[in-house]
């Protein structure tokens, strides 16, 4: 199976080349763990290769996303790519008549997309009138987006587990969690792969996840 590079060379190596092509990956974690930056880094990796990429934000505005990226050396080219191979779509939560189905319809207005990031899945629950309805429409959305041939990352704030508590981890092909851990009384970020269909990986082994002035990278340290 062909692979899609993640934007983190060491993570690509651990996963045998990257995420399996045309899969849905849930990236969960608490506030400040790096979910948004992980998603944008994934898109910039593809956009630089000429792949069509779209970041769908239910939180920050496009201006806020760009400002966050420009704080890191390896992500400063974000503005040059917008309007060419990268789009940032902001969907306001107060928008009337919004539903997950209409949400997907908005995405179909773009030319064929190779990579999509949706941030934040927790907010999508507001588009449904029940938990059951959300699960059904969420599953339908994933099937549709995979069917058109795109690789999808969904960012989500975890609810004490590895997803938001509405079964998203079950529906997605892969699950990565970002978190803060204490190592010798020093707080550090970590990345853990909990699930990844069609690929071998170190199951549930936390790896050091570094965010510095240069950008994002996976460290050599395994946190055991």
Where do the model's predicted regions map?
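Structural beta-sheet core signal
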Residues: 55, 152-154
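Pre-Walker A adenine-sensing motif
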Residues: 6-18
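Phosphate-binding/switch loop-helix module in NTP-utilizing enzymes
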Residues: 89-150
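Phosphate-binding/switch region of NTP-binding enzymes
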Residues: 154-214, 224
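Conserved P-loop
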Residues: 25, 30-95
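Short glycine-/polar-rich loops that comprise or flank the Walker A/P-loop
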Residues: 49-52, 84, 149-150, 171-174, ...
């Amino acid at each position: 199976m062909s692979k899609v590079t993640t934007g983190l060379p060491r993570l690509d190596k651990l996963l045998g080349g990257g995420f399996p092509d045309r899969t849905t990956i849930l990236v969960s974690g608490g506030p400040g763990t790096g979910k948004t930056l992980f998603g944008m880094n994934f898109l910039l990796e593809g956009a630089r290769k000429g792949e069509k990429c779209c970041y769908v934000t239910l939180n920050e505005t496009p201006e806020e996303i760009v400002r966050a990226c420009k704080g890191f050396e390896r992500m400063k080219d974000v503005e040059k790519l917008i309007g060419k191979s990268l789009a940032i779509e902001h969907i306001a939560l107060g928008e009337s008549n919004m539903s997950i189905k209409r949400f997907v319809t908005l995405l179909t207005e773009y030319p064929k997309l190779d990579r999509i990031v949706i941030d934040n899945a927790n907010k999508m629950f507001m588009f449904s009138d029940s938990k059951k309805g959300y699960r059904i429409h969420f599953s339908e959305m994933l099937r549709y987006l995979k069917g058109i041939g795109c690789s999808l990352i969904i960012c989500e704030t975890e609810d004490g587990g590895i997803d938001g508590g509405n079964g998203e981890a079950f529906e997605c092909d892969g699950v990565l969690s970002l978190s803060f851990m204490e190592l010798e009384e020093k707080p550090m970020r970590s990345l853990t792969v909990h699930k990844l269909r069609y690929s071998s990986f170190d199951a549930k082994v936390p790896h050091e996840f570094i965010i510095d002035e240069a950008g994002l990278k996976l460290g050599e340290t395994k946190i055991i």
